[in-house]
Amino acid sequence: MAEKEVTPLTAVKVEALVVMKIIKHCSQVFPTTATGSIVGMDVDGVLEITNTFPFPVVEVPPESHFDNAAPNPAAAAPRAKANTVYQAEMIRMLREVNVDANNVGWYTSANMGNFVNMNVIENQFFYQKEMNERTVALVHDPSRSAQGSLSLRAFRLSPKFMAAFKDNKFTSDELQKSNLKYQDILVELPVEIHNSHLITSFIHQLQNQTQATPAEIPTSLATLESSPFAKQTILAPNFDNLSLSIDPFLEKNCDLLLDSIETHHTETSNFQYYQRSLAREQAKITAWQAKRKAENATRATLKQPPLPEDEWQRLFKLPQEPSRLDSMLNSRQVEQYARQIDSFVSSTTGKMFAVKGNLLPSEIAK
């Protein structure tokens, strides 16, 4: 009997109650990181998330000094051993009350779209490798949601990145062989928010407007001019649109983008330093090998045994190439900031071009 072909995940369907729980938890602990577990089921490639619960955070006492303590316990909570036991116990209790008790991933909060980091990568790698391969990471950004639209996204690690991360192959040669780019780290899945039929019908009842009373026909011109509708015009000037104040969200994103670009420059400088060190050592090895060959040629004429030519491996030590993983994650984060700025910059740039003549009168004169 042939095995049933596995359908790849194509979308994520989240219950509205789960969304409200995630928003509440992330808003309560903002701006610190909030993490939790999500449960549900996989239905023909659509991951249906029906329940969630937060992870407890074990605070390290201030008087204790552990060298291996995580700098952010909440961010590392999904893969903590204590929380793994806690999650299994919670899922067992949910199963006893006939609730969907399949582990389908975890959720985390982000600030200004800053979620592409090692904690998120390690947590999702742990879930896809140890828990369940068909798991997702939900990322909720309270700062972005405060702008008026819900920011809830679902991500998975690509199979290509999973293989490279498992073997820790992030050198330049390995990345060229596997053709792994920073765009291949995360795979985003579309998110759909689902309501029950009862809630949907209730929302439609709330949206039902009151019946409008028939308008009275004005009897004279004076009555028409005194009407409150005559004093309101759609074409009235709105001077608020001329305000040149930049959105604080956009300003903060620009600052974070500059910080990420500076980090990228630092990573590039470190890699260039490695290349220079490698070139110096290789030049020393080449000079040593040439000298040893000349010595062996002289010894051959004197009918003496040759000296070993592989002794340079003991005398010289080539520098180890730094991992390119941090640089890849930072590049992916730069792309994330650039997309966010691109979505907010349209209204501001229009105002800047409108006042360009007053700011730079010399260009207008030319």
Swiss-Prot record:
Description of how the protein assembles with itself and partners: Component of the eukaryotic translation initiation factor 3 (eIF-3) complex.
Keywords, comma-separated and alphabetical: Cytoplasm, Initiation factor, Protein biosynthesis
UniProt organism field: Emericella nidulans (strain FGSC A4 / ATCC 38163 / CBS 112.46 / NRRL 194 / M139) (Aspergillus nidulans)
Record-level GO BP terms: formation of cytoplasmic translation initiation complex; translational initiation
Residues spanning the signal sequence: none
Pfam families: eIF3h_C (PF19445), JAB (PF01398)
Protein name, entry field: Eukaryotic translation initiation factor 3 subunit H
UniProt subcellular location: Cytoplasm
Family as reported in the entry's similarity comment: Belongs to the eIF-3 subunit H family.
UniProt GO MF annotations: metallopeptidase activity; translation initiation factor activity
Residue span, MPN domain: 12-161
Top-level lineage group: Eukaryota
Function, as annotated: Component of the eukaryotic translation initiation factor 3 (eIF-3) complex, which is involved in protein synthesis of a specialized repertoire of mRNAs and, together with other initiation factors, stimulates binding of mRNA and methionyl-tRNAi to the 40S ribosome. The eIF-3 complex specifically targets and initiates translation of a subset of mRNAs involved in cell proliferation.
Gene Ontology CC: one annotated term: eukaryotic 43S preinitiation complex
InterPro entries linked to this entry: eIF3h, eIF3h_C, JAMM/MPN+_dom, JAMM_MPN+_peptidase_M67A, MPN
